[in-house]
C-alpha cells in the first residue's frame, strides 16, 4: 500500500512541531501518600519534521503511548521523549500532559474528609543535542481577603476565590503535594471540599485574620521558592476573581535561568 507520508516534499520548509493534540488517555501519576494515582491525561505530542519529509506518522504517537502505558513523572518523560525521537526519526520531541490530581483533605475542625481537585501539567522537550527540558505546573484554588477592605470597613471585608498557577524547573524530583502546600500556605486561607458549620467559622475567621492582596500572595510564593535550592526557575501567576468587581486582580513573577 502506498505511503504518501514517506514521499519527499519540495517546498523547502521544515516544521517546528507536528503531531497530535488533546488526546485523552488513562495515565498513572506518582502520589506521595498512596504511591500511585490513576487519572486521565490530556496529551499533546509533537516532533519536528525536516524540510524534505512530507509528513510524520500520526498513528505512531498513540501506538507508542499505549505500548508504554506510562507512569507520568519527570523520569519517565525523558524515556517517552527519547522513544518519540527514535520511532518517528525526529531530531526533537515535545510532550505536554495535563491531568486532574486529587488529594484527600480533612476539614480543619470537624475532620470531615473530602477530595480536592488540582489541575497539574508536565511539559517536556528533548532537543536535537539530547538535552531535556522539563517543567512541572500546578493550578491551586485559594481564598483571599482584601486588606484594604478590612482596614476601612467597620465590619467585615470582601473576599473571593482565587487561582495560583505555579510552574517550576528543578534539579531533583518535586512532589505535587509539596507545591500545592507551598501555595496554600501563602493564601489568606486554603480551600476544602467539605465544610461543616464549625469548619466554615474557622475558615472565615482565618481568612479575615490573614488578609492578602494578589501582590502579597505572589511575593510570598516567590520568596519560598527562592529559598529552595532545588528550584532553578519558576513562574507564578495569581488571579483573584474579585467579588466586588466584574474583573480580576492579577500578579505574576518569573525568576531563574532557562537553559538555552
Swiss-Prot record:
GO molecular function, one term: GTP cyclohydrolase I activity
Pathway: Cofactor biosynthesis; 7,8-dihydroneopterin triphosphate biosynthesis; 7,8-dihydroneopterin triphosphate from GTP: step 1/1
InterPro entries in UniProt: GTP_cyclohydrolase_FolE2, GTP_cyclohydrolase_FolE2/MptA
One BP annotation, GO: tetrahydrofolate biosynthetic process
Top-level taxon: Bacteria
Entry EC number(s): 3.5.4.16
Site (May be catalytically important): 146
Family per similarity comment: Belongs to the GTP cyclohydrolase IV family.
Function (record text): Converts GTP to 7,8-dihydroneopterin triphosphate.
Protein name (record): GTP cyclohydrolase FolE2
Species of origin: Desulfosudis oleivorans (strain DSM 6200 / JCM 39069 / Hxd3)
